[in-house]
Amino acid sequence: MAVDKEVQLHAQAWDHALSYIKPTALDAAVELEIPDILEDHGGPMSLSELSAATGCPREPLYRLMRFLIFHGIFTKSDDCYAQSPLSRLFTRENLGLYMLMQATPATRSPAGLSGEALKTGTPLYLKSIRGEDSWNDPAYGFHMRAFTNAMTAHSRLTAAAIVTNYPTAFDGVRSVVDVGGRHGMAIGRLVEAFPWVRGITFDLPEIVADAPPLKGVDFVGGDMFKSVPKADAVMLMWILHDWSDDKCIEILKKCKEAIPTSTGKVMIVDAIINEEGEGDEFSGARLSLDMIMMATTTQGKERSYKEWVHLLNKAGFSKHSVKNIKTIEFVIDAYP
């Protein structure tokens, strides 16, 4: 079918767009000596054993191994990790030292992964900007313009996916707040498709101050950790993956306070990492995004369905539903 072909092409495009992260993940594994450790051990190792042997904390190591197993580098059985014929070729007696040549400060990408960064929790990206907060550093105006343009383009694509694949998303909704919506490109597209909805873009005051006018959209400045404007629905598009679990719970509680108890909903538009043995065309791209979050942030990550459910329960939501919109994200509707 034509639609299926379009989805496949979209998934392939995402894979290409995120492809830079894969070799840096393999570099990080070689830096951590994972192929050699598994080879010397002579058999499978648990996550705890591998963490102790590499000096890498369990969570980043788990995420790294999940990604590399998906790509066939290592294997996993009964919650233990093992060599594959391919991973054996990355020991130091084989191509391991060649990989390390690509992982020197002169050759590695500052937006890539490294073994040392995984151990310390300080991504190379943050070191490359002198440990400062890149989002607020005026010296990185060029980067921020590129970031804003990329997020604008992405939000339009995601909004279009909602319009096409979730046409009932705003049934019974008269107003929606787009938290962290920057200049309103996503909510503008949604209001255009669902004209009975009043859109509110909510972001930091300095961001909404520069936003051009949009038909059907109001702009409100503020802090999502303090309060969120009242509306029938609150949308969080590619917001929560930037934050730790504790911060996500804070944000979700503020969003819950902003909606009607009986009829409101919070729409989380974010990736859901597939469980082992499950997946679709976008599974690889979602795992690549998780590696990029690990490479460029200290808190961000893509979450599995179980991890999302944990956050919703902790934030006090009573029920939820998940809609596949045939792109890299899903829509999770959470109800008070």
UniProtKB/Swiss-Prot annotation:
Named in its record, the pathway it takes part in is:
Flavonoid metabolism
Does S-adenosyl-L-methionine count among this protein's keywords?
yes
Q: Does the keyword Transferase apply?
A: yes
SUPFAM superfamilies (alphabetical): S-adenosyl-L-methionine-dependent methyltransferases, Winged helix' DNA-binding domain
- Keyword field: Methyltransferase, S-adenosyl-L-methionine, Transferase
Q: Which cysteines are joined by disulfide bonds?
A: none
Question: What Pfam families would the database entry show?
Answer: Dimerisation (PF08100), Methyltransf_2 (PF00891)
GO biological processes: methylation
GO MF annotation list: O-methyltransferase activity; protein dimerization activity
The catalytic residues are: H241
Give the catalysed reaction(s), semicolon-separated.
ladanein + S-adenosyl-L-methionine = salvigenin + S-adenosyl-L-homocysteine + H(+); scutellarein 7-methyl ether + S-adenosyl-L-methionine = cirsimaritin + S-adenosyl-L-homocysteine + H(+)
Question: Which EC number(s) does the record attach to this protein?
Answer: 2.1.1.-
User: So where does S-adenosyl-L-methionine get bound?
Assistant: Y140, D203
Q: Which domain of life is it from?
A: Eukaryota
* Biotech uses: Nevadensin is a selective inhibitor of human carboxylesterase 1 (hCE-1), a key enzyme responsible for the hydrolysis of a wide range of endogenous and xenobiotic esters.
Assigned protein family? Belongs to the class I-like SAM-binding methyltransferase superfamily. Cation-independent O-methyltransferase family.
User: What task does this protein carry out?
Assistant: Flavonoid 6-O-methyltransferase involved in the biosynthesis of polymethoxylated flavonoids natural products such as nevadensin and salvigenin, aroma compounds which contribute to the flavor of sweet basil, and exhibit pharmacological activities such as anti-allergic, anti-oxidant, antibacterial, anti-proliferative, and anti-inflammatory effects.
Assembly state and interactors? Homodimer.
Q: What is this protein called?
A: Flavonoid 6-O-methyltransferase 6
